[in-house]
Amino acid sequence: MERLLIRGGRRLEGEIRISGAKNAALPIMAATLLADGPMTVGNIPHLHDITTTMELLGRMGVGLTVDERMRVEADPRSLHSCHAPYELVKTMRASILVLGPLLARYGEAQVSLPGGCAIGSRPVNLHVEGLRAMGAELTVEEGYIKARCDRLRGARIVLELVTVTGTENLMMAAALAEGTTVIENAAREPEVVDLADCLNAMGAKIQGAGTDTLTIEGVERLNGIHYDVLPDRIESGTYLIAAAITGGRIKLKDTAPKLLDAVLVKLEEAGARIETGPDWISLEMEGRPRSVSVRTAPYPGFPTDMQAQFCALDCIAEGTGTITETVFENRFMHCLEMQRMGADIRIEGNTAILRGVPALKGAPVMATDLRASASLVLAGLVARGETRVDRIYHIDRGYECIEEKLAQLGADIRRVPA
């Protein structure tokens, strides 16, 4: 076990490179199961969830090699098992993404019900119902989804709720199905579009990515290719807030400004000066931020994965802001920890009301999920004295070398044994 120690009060300044998006890399790594030969995936972030996915693929028999630039070559021709065991799946919800590819390519799958962050029910029933509509036989027994099929058949699937992983799983399954599949109320997130772009480059026939209706014409085979995943928009937003909250000035390289419109608008509302180019964003903040109010929504709305970070900003901003969470349940656990640091926060249903205070005070705090842990680090950067963030294994699931990147910008932060 490790923790982060942060001494706040330093203005962040400098340049950093943004990593590839974990939420794009994970489904694309699962999509390698669909290929009929070796496939190389580049711009992969070095994260615990990526390592877990590689271990899962390797356990199934996929041949894996990784070079010094974190390019992963996966060769599914040596696959000998369609079993995703509990000891791997329990730590990461995205492991459910192997279900669709295994069924479509090999006709069977046995996948443990997934784990991951404890931020609401996040049911997998939409995956199961969609695959049943395509002709698969699925049962849930002893904590496992057990599935079989001949060749999947195209179907019209109307998702009851917008689900990113559900859309991705069904899209991958439909790519090799017989006939045409239409997915309505599909997720529109950039990571879904990136997966569709990857599948199309492999030979799939997918139309409508980025809209709420996907049309997938099944093909007989998909080729192994090289594909680079898109930059991480959530990591980008987190470091922009780190600069804004400390009155700093930074430039992000290898990022994608067009994916961050909802976040950049709110940062400008808070008083930041922002400039963008094709693959870079610069931000400068002078003085205390102004409070902002946000309401989370599926893309292209304000991302739920950024609300905890804006909570940290509102804690020390001038004025009162509100954060309304409409996507997941139980996603304000970080607020209790911020109150230990002197934050003035009141929770009413699915809304947090934050009245900015002149300063936070360093304190021992505990991370409860991935984005909550990032928000506590942000609060520590601006707090007086030392903040100790425990249970940082959460943050290692989604941020590559966070203490190194922040130290590169001038933060006083270090990782120590707990």
UniProtKB/Swiss-Prot annotation:
Keywords: Cell cycle, Cell division, Cell shape, Cell wall biogenesis/degradation, Cytoplasm, Peptidoglycan synthesis, Pyruvate, Transferase. Its main location: cytoplasm. Phosphoenolpyruvate binds at K22, N23. GO terms for cellular component: cytoplasm. It is found in: Cytoplasm. Its EC number is 2.5.1.7. GO terms for molecular function: UDP-N-acetylglucosamine 1-carboxyvinyltransferase activity. UDP-N-acetyl-alpha-D-glucosamine binds at R93, D305, V327. Pathway: Cell wall biogenesis; peptidoglycan biosynthesis. GO terms for biological process: cell division; cell wall organization; peptidoglycan biosynthetic process; regulation of cell shape; UDP-N-acetylgalactosamine biosynthetic process. The modification 2-(S-cysteinyl)pyruvic acid O-phosphothioketal is found at C117. It is an enzyme of class 2 (transferase). It catalyses: phosphoenolpyruvate + UDP-N-acetyl-alpha-D-glucosamine = UDP-N-acetyl-3-O-(1-carboxyvinyl)-alpha-D-glucosamine + phosphate. It comes from the Bacteria. The active site is at C117. InterPro entries: Enolpyruvate_Tfrase_dom (IPR001986), Enolpyruvate_Tfrase_sf (IPR036968), MurA_subfamily (IPR050068), RNA3'P_cycl/enolpyr_Trfase_a/b (IPR013792), UDP_GlcNAc_COvinyl_MurA (IPR005750). Belongs to the EPSP synthase family. MurA subfamily. Cell wall formation. Adds enolpyruvyl to UDP-N-acetylglucosamine. This is UDP-N-acetylglucosamine 1-carboxyvinyltransferase. It comes from Alkalilimnicola ehrlichii (strain ATCC BAA-1101 / DSM 17681 / MLHE-1).
